[in-house]
Amino acid sequence: MAKSSWEGNCFLNFFNNKSSSGKDDKTIFKSKFTSPYKLLKCSYDQEGRCILPILHTAGGLVGGDLLEFEANIGINSKVLLTTSSAQKVYGSVGRSKINPEGTFSSQKTKISILDNSHLEYLPQETIVFANGLYSQEFNIKISDNSSFLFTDLIRLGRSSAGESIESGVFRSKLEIMRNGNLCDDWEFVDQIELTKFSFEAKSGMDFKPVFGSLIWICEKEFPITKISYLKEKIKIIFKENNNYLSLGTLENGLSIRFLGTSSQDARKCFFSIWTQIRTVCGFCKPEYQGVWPLQDL
């Protein structure tokens, strides 16, 4: 019997192709992928950063779908990974008489960031429709003198239709480890489960359907004064925003949470914070990507 679910995988290997003359300093990549993954044309900014949008051609996930994504960021590389559209998770609970409790769709992501490299992984939002079941896992390994920026934006249900997650479940697990000379050290661990209960609870989402996380892991020797400056800039962004935001200081980086009713507000907020992170790191100002929603401009 033919399988009705997707099992797709994508493997990306990035490396710096700086020539001996030093004139051509940019990050290039090799890839291997299966449906429903597809890679759009990459582009480069003034720093030679490889900007690669990833497309999910199936239009969404249903129960039983499994996606596996792996990226290796080689030495002296700069990479911006994003997606060309929001990831949609369709309802699974109650759809089958054989399996009425539904089946989780899942995505597993594994990333390795080698010396003096910088990865920005900024996928568009994940929309979990009513009764959708979705699980995602991220396993990140990063060297001492590299950095990692990650955003994760979740919307529960279609608010315009009065829909919430109902009997659905969203689960997320993020593990970031620092590759040491003698042993690996835990840098950051985060586990989240969102259900109808957490959506409605006063101590949870309080009926606000949009939840987002921005995690920034910097180099181990990154100046504390620059982190303090960045925190003050982020607090100014918070004051200009009418949503619920929190800022946490990590051993080497920052953790930011967003809770509100508008995905657009979340994207704009995270873009402003991203701009400030680029500034304190001495990188060029980020540009709005053509695959992102035009209404945010």
Swiss-Prot record:
GO cellular component term of the entry, any: cytoplasm
Instruction: Alphabetically list the UniProt keywords.
Output: Chaperone, Cytoplasm, Nickel insertion
Q: Which Pfam families match?
A: UreD
Query: Where does it reside?
Result: Cytoplasm
Q: Which GO terms describe its molecular function?
A: nickel cation binding
Oligomeric and partner information: UreD, UreF and UreG form a complex that acts as a GTP-hydrolysis-dependent molecular chaperone, activating the urease apoprotein by helping to assemble the nickel containing metallocenter of UreC. The UreE protein probably delivers the nickel.
Family in the record? Belongs to the UreD family.
Q: Spell out the HAMAP family in the cross-references.
A: UreD
What is its biological role?
Required for maturation of urease via the functional incorporation of the urease nickel metallocenter.
Query: What name goes with this protein?
Result: Urease accessory protein UreD
**Organism whose genome encodes this protein:** Prochlorococcus marinus subsp. pastoris (strain CCMP1986 / NIES-2087 / MED4)
